[in-house]
Structures are given as structure tokens and as C-alpha cells.
Regions:
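Helix-to-loop junction immediately C-terminal to a conserved catalytic motif
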Residues: 80
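Conserved ABC transporter NBD signature motif
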Residues: 88-96
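Conserved signature/switch motifs of ABC ATPase nucleotide-binding domains
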Residues: 110, 134, 165-168, 182, ...
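Short coil-to-helix segment of the ABC ATPase nucleotide-binding domain corresponding to the Q-loop/switch region
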Residues: 126-133
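The conserved cystathionine-beta-synthase
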Residues: 292-323, 331-344
Length: 344
């Protein structure tokens, strides 16, 4: 298989056990059906990540959503080897991350992979421009080139004019933009985000989400994003993994998860989601033709976009595919069925 055909990131059967020993006994007990609490009591070991496998395509945003203690932050640290997995495999475009020595791993972190944490980690004694250029400085890029790149990234994240300020002169949202610019400056293949926006005020948080969405449209990085906020996961993710007790309950697109929650646990999150904002028109499309309707809508449009049309008097709207070919219709009844299900 050509390297371009390989996933940007591939994890297979990742386990992480904290505590004395090599963790093999705890893993065996998990496979035999013992609960995490009983394993902790019997072995003094905590099973934080349990047999997790997933791959991320180039340019995809993969969101891992879970509550506190679900293992999501441990997982992303295993992915980057900030924490060593107990068992499993991690590959970057086919390269075995777990087989790399310290120097090889440093090279990966310097250029192929960047991480953005909840706490910004900016150097208080360095100006904004020097914070952004730090990764390039570590790579021994000459000063003129790294300042030019840092200036470009500063403009990219909307902070043009703030180069000579210090971190303490910036708001929390601005500091996180600096952290994002620093991560982007080394031109990484993979960006890892560990709840980067959770400490920000709601309005600033939404701005940062919008910023990441905008950057992804133009830069197309491979992103793994950790969050405890289901709404944030729905906004950002091409695919979402719902994590509970160290393992994935369900993996799918936002639409797949909202329309078909796989477990009662996932359903608890889905129940409060306004379906019309997440589900596409194709989920309410039925067979038929609209003889009198002049209105059409793409099957990929969100349901909320057609509700005003139906309220204005259109009883039937033609649904088209990407080639503008009619594939069916949507009517008030099919939309009402979805909205009624939301109220149950």
C-alpha cells in the first residue's frame, strides 16, 4: 500500500493500565468481565484505556467525547507517547510510533505532530511572536525564516498587530490563539487538541470553534480533538467517538450518532440535541416527485434550512443529489416525524 493511501493515524488495541506491575493481570481480568472498580481493589491497578482501536484519515477531524474519568485525555497522551501505552500499536502514516527511539520521537513532535492543551503553556518572558516561533527555534531554523513564518501564523489566527505583546497582556481566547499559531507554525501533519477551549468563556469558546473550522477548510490538517462537550463534538467532528470507562461506546458521523444512538449512554447525550440542526435532508427524504414545486434542496442540507420553506406554504420540496438529479421529495409529514421524535 502506498503511503498516501495509509491513514494519517492508526491505533490498534490500545490499553493503558496505571499501577504496579506490567498491567497484564488487569487486562486479563477485564477480558474476563471484571469491573474497573473490582480490578482496582484486587490489583491496585487502574484500567484507564481499554482495547481502543481507530484510524483517522488525512484531513479528517476526529473528536473523542467523554465525561471526566472516561479515559479520553489518557488516550490522546498514549497517541503521542507522552504516556506509554501498556499494550497496542500506534502508527503515523505507517510508521510505528511505539518502536521509535527518543531521538526519532523528538523529531516527530518537532515537525509531524503538534499538541494544544487546555492550559496555554506560553512562555511569560517571551513576546507573542517568539512564543509562536519557539518550535521553529527548536528545529534550529534561522531567525529571519522563523519570524516570517510566525508572523504568517499570527495573521492566520487573527492576531495581526500583537506580535510584540507579552502573553499576560492578552485575553484567554487570544492566548489560546497564540497556542494554536505555535502549533501550526511547524507545519504539522497531525494536530492533537486536549480540551483546548474548555476554560474559555462561552462566546470566546464559540469563536475559537469557528476559527478551527475555518482553518480546517483551508489547511486540511489531520485533527484529533478531545472534549467533554457533546455540542462541541457535533460542531467540529467529521466523526465522533463517544468514550466511557476507557472504551468507545460508539463511533460515527454526527448524523449517524444523533439518528441512531447505539447504547443508552449515547442516547442520554442525543436526547437534548436539536435534530433539525444536525440531521440532513436525506434522512427525511421519501420517494415521489413534486409536480408543482419549483423549490429544490440538496440532500446534504440540514433540515433546519427547509423548515421556513415548509412554513411559508410549500407542501413538497424536491431533493437533489450532488449532480442536481432529483432523488425524492421532502414534505411536512416527514419533517414532523423527526421533530416529534425529538420531543419524546
Amino acid at each position: 500500500m502506498e503511503s498516501g493511501d495509509l491513514p494519517a493515524l492508526d491505533l490498534r488495541n490500545i490499553w493503558k493500565v496505571f499501577g504496579p506491575g506490567d498491567g497484564s493481570r488487569a487486562i486479563e481480568l477485564v477480558k474476563n468481565g471484571m469491573s474497573r472498580s473490582d480490578i482496582l481493589q484486587q490489583t491496585q491497578q487502574t484500567v484507564a484505556v481499554r482495547d481502543v482501536s481507530f484510524s483517522v484519515a488525512r484531513g479528517e477531524t476526529f473528536v473523542v467525547m467523554g465525561l471526566s474519568g472516561s479515559g479520553k485525555s489518557t488516550l490522546i497522551r498514549c497517541l503521542s507517547r507522552l504516556i506509554e501505552p501498556t499494550q497496542g500499536e500506534v502508527s503515523l502514516s505507517g510508521d510505528n510510533l511505539l518502536a521509535m527511539n527518543e531521538e526519532q520521537l523528538r523529531e516527530v513532535r518537532r515537525g509531524r505532530m503538534s499538541m494544544v492543551f487546555q492550559h496555554f503553556g506560553l512562555f511569560p518572558h517571551r513576546k507573542v511572536i517568539d512564543n509562536i516561533a519557539y518550535g521553529l527555534e527548536v528545529q534550529k531554523i534561522d531567525k529571519q525564516a522563523r519570524i516570517a513564518k510566525a508572523t504568517e501564523m499570527l495573521k492566520t489566527v487573527g492576531l495581526d498587530g500583537w506580535a510584540d505583546h507579552y502573553p499576560q497582556q492578552l485575553s484567554g481566547g487570544m492566548q489560546q490563539r497564540v497556542g494554536l499559531a505555535r502549533a501550526l507554525a511547524v507545519d504539522p501533519q497531525i494536530l492533537l487538541f486536549d480540551e483546548p477551549f474548555s476554560a474559555l468563556d462561552p462566546l470566546i469558546r464559540k469563536e475559537m470553534q469557528d476559527e478551527l473550522i475555518r482553518l480546517q477548510k483551508t489547511m486540511q490538517r489531520t485533527v484529533v480533538f478531545i472534549t467533554h462537550d457533546f455540542a462541541e463534538a457535533l460542531r467540529l467532528g467529521d466523526r465522533i467517538a463517544i468514550m466511557k470507562d476507557g472504551s468507545f461506546d460508539q463511533v460515527g458521523t454526527p448524523e449517524e450518532i444523533v439518528s441512531s444512538p447505539a447504547t443508552p449512554y449515547v442516547r442520554e447525550f442525543v436526547n437534548d440535541v436539536p435534530r433539525a440542526k444536525v440531521l440532513s435532508v436525506k434522512t427525511v427524504t421519501v420517494a415521489g416527485t413534486a409536480a408543482t414545486s419549483s423549490r429544490t434542496v440538496m440532500s446534504t442540507a440540514k433540515i433546519e434550512t427547509i423548515i421556513p420553506m415548509l412554513l411559508e406554504g410549500d407542501e413538497v420540496i424536491t431533493v437533489t443529489d450532488a449532480t442536481n438529479k432529483a432523488i425524492g421529495i421532502v414534505n411536512r409529514q416527514s419533517v414532523a416525524k423527526i421533530l416529534q421524535a425529538e420531543q419524546k
